[in-house]
Structure formats: C-alpha cells, structure tokens
Amino acid sequence: MSVLCLGEVWLELNAAMAPELTETFRAQTGGWGAGFCRRYAALGGQAALLAQLGADPFGRKLAAQLARDGVDCSLLCFTDAFPTPVVFTGADTALPYRAHTAGLALGPEQLEAAPFRGSSAFCFSSAGLVDSPLRLAHLKALAAARDAGALCCYLPRLAQAAPYWPQREALCQTALQFLDRADVLFLEESDLLLLFGSRELRTALFALFTGHVQLIFFYKKDRILAFTRSVMASAAKKDQSPALVLYRMEKMMLPVSALPRLNKSELNALIG
C-alpha cells in the first residue's frame, strides 16, 4: 500500500543570499508534498504525489527528478493553461510566483476515488490550502480518503507555509478549520504558537482532540510526544521525521479504528 500526498510542486531557485542580491541560483525541487514523498520513498516506502504541473520544460524536469527519487508520479497532472510555479529563496527569504500557476489550479474534478482505495494514508499540509481550486481538491481528497479507510494526516507547518499566504491570519483560520478533519496531527511548537498563542501543548489539547482527531505527534526542540485521547508517550528527538513515523505506522498496519486503542508501548515503537 502507498501513501498519497496532495500539494504543490514548484521549481525552487535557491541562492546563498537574498534573491535581489545574487546572480546565480541553484535549481531544485520544492513544495511540501514533493519533499514529503521523497523522504518517504527514501525510507523504502511507496509514496504517490497528487499535484499539477505546467506542460512546460520546468514541469517535465521536476516530474523526471521526482521519478528518479523514487516517487510514484503516475497521478501527476499536466496543463497547458498554467505554468509551473517558481519560487526564489535565499537568506531566509521566499519570493513565490504561484498565484496563477498549475499547482493551485488543480481542482476537485480532476481527482478520482480509485487511488485512495489502495492507500494506507493521505497526507496534506497548509501551503496548498490557500483560497484556490486546490483547497477544494483537498476537501474532496479528504472525503475520498475517509471513504476508503485511509488515515488522514495533517502536517500544518504554519511557519513554513506563511510566506506562501497573502495573510497570516487567513492561514491560521483555515488551518483551524482543517484540524478536526484529520485522524492524525503532526504538530510543531510554532504551530501551537500561531494557532493558540502559546507553545504549551497542555493548553491546546482539549481544542485539538475534536472531530476525527485520534492521534497527535508533537515535535519539541529535544523531544517528541505522542498522544491519544487516553495515553501519552515521550522520546528523545533524533531523526524521527513525520515520514519515518508514518512509515512505522504503515508497517504496523494500523487502521483508523485502531488509533484510539494504541497503548504506550505501541506509541513508543512509533516515536522511539
């Protein structure tokens, strides 16, 4: 079984200094969905990317690189109507050119239910939830994943998504609307700060365990915490990326119905 990720893929032009001060850029594959799929594939898992690229040289280049990295690109869409997005990065600055590009133009009518039936999990993040056809595609994908029994996993990554949103307040409000649609949350301290005004998880747990949410992974600077509604586990932070934790969940063959019954030893096996 495979993991499905919905998001954008863009050509990232990276420089060692601020983009306006450099003459040389290094081209690489950008976008949260692309990055997550590459990390999952590197672990030996099967990761398929749901995204749309322009039917242009940049789009073909990115798709070829993802395929070389072991990502299943069979669900990628290509369009002549919009170009592949480009993002300039450097010196902690991101200048995205994506407002009228292929990634955000991926609409719900382009998604089929069949790929979700053979998937163990569906993963998404916040950058692609900006007001666009892609946000509507996320809603359809969540419904299809839930109908298929796949785990719905949300990685808000609000600090990383903020440069790609016109307003931070709109980003946070949208993230709050999507939290309870997931079965599993992967949170960072910066997520809590932006959503609830505090880095303390205790102040947010009651608000987080609503809707479909059954399992929360919380990444602190030096530790990872795992919570169900009744059990908590903790481990020293090493290299337990969300991709690795999800890979372990797939190996344990955990269906959605098993999440509320996870015990402390099982949580430790996921994060240890």
Specify the residue positions occupied by each region the protein language model found.
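Short, small-residue alpha-helix embedded
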Residues: C37-R39, G45, S230-L259
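Active-site-proximal loop/turn and secondary-structure-junction residues that shape catalytic pockets
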Residues: G128, L158-Q160, D191
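Conserved phosphate/ATP/ADP-binding segment of small-molecule kinases
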Residues: A162-R229, M249, P260-N263, L267
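Short beta-strand/loop segments at the ligand-binding rim of alpha/beta enzyme cores
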Residues: G149-P156
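Conserved N-terminal subdomain of the carbohydrate kinase-like
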Residues: Q46-S126
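Catalytic-core regions built around general acid/base machinery
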Residues: A137-A148, Q173-R181
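Glycine-rich phosphate/adenosyl-contacting loop at the front of the ribokinase-like
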Residues: M1-V71, N263-G272
